[in-house]
């Protein structure tokens, strides 16, 4: 299904004939490529494909980049090389995400991985080793007091709450209201 074109004049004639008679070429599925010698080639993808493969996308991008680099000094009107590309419409029906028939954006996107956020606790931080450290500000000595290293963030938060309960008379804040506090 390759049709070579020797010049831009032949290409323009072929495009005009295809626009006037759509049975000759379904221009929603064909891609035109040019080579170094200004020969244009009409490439039709496999009829069962509903979107471009990575190789087809790569070829289109490389061809477009060559076109831009080779015509960097020339204006678009005087350029004899043409690259016309069109992506075939997806034939799977309406998009399940946006509900639009023939949607290009949703069908080509990769699913995003959801990032699970860890709950933040006051006075608790994660160490590079993966363990959790707890420390609290001691108002008497005006320094941080080390409470220890724990396997889970909840265990470190409980340690912080216990230490904050000691300073409660001095308005110590805790992580959550439902956690049991010690009075001394």
UniProtKB/Swiss-Prot annotation:
Any single biological process term in GO: ethylene-activated signaling pathway
Gene Ontology MF annotations: DNA binding; DNA-binding transcription factor activity
Residue range(s) of DNA binding per entry: 120-177
Keywords for the protein's UniProt record, in alphabetical order: Activator, DNA-binding, Ethylene signaling pathway, Nucleus, Transcription, Transcription regulation
Alphabetized SUPFAM superfamilies for the sequence: DNA-binding domain (SSF54171)
Subcellular location: Nucleus
PROSITE patterns: AP2_ERF (PS51032)
Gene3D superfamilies tied to this protein: AP2/ERF domain (3.30.730.10)
One GO term describing the cellular component: nucleus
Keyword set includes Nucleus: yes
TM region positions: none
Function: Probably acts as a transcriptional activator. Binds to the GCC-box pathogenesis-related promoter element. May be involved in the regulation of gene expression by stress factors and by components of stress signal transduction pathways.
Protein family according to the UniProt entry: Belongs to the AP2/ERF transcription factor family. ERF subfamily.
Record's protein name: Ethylene-responsive transcription factor ERF122
Gene source species: Arabidopsis thaliana (Mouse-ear cress)
Gene name linked to the record: ERF122
